Amino acid sequence: MFFDASVLVQCTNAQAPDKMGRARSLVAHATLTGSAMVSAAGLADLYQRLVAEQAVPPDRAQALVLACADWQVVPVDSALLRAGMDLAGLFRLPLCDAITVQAAIQAGASTLYADHLQHGQRWGGLTLVNPFLGPAGSR
């Protein structure tokens, strides 16, 4: 279960309780089963979003990010950057999203949870899932 920062940030979004509950449930399940994965770039993005968008105090944001850092974290190296740029060019994705997709593929994830990419899109064995669509939480 690979997480994009767009889903993780919803864990603190009291303005959208359905999304917050769904995100927390996914994170709890992934953490308990040891299947939680994220990229180092995603952790940096999460910190920025928590502080800037959710007004989470920096020390609290750091604690939340470091809790996620205990998961399987995919580092962004030159090979991942190159693969991300190739994917971005091929599919006209923003580079940060392409790096997330490539990190999930590199980690061997079967599911990438993100709320802004095309739900159901597949790249090999990886499927993009918007966890906030459908009965578990509408957009």
Residue ranges, per PLM feature:
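Acidic active-site catalytic centers that drive phospho-/nucleotidyl reactions
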Residues: 4, 45, 97, 115-116
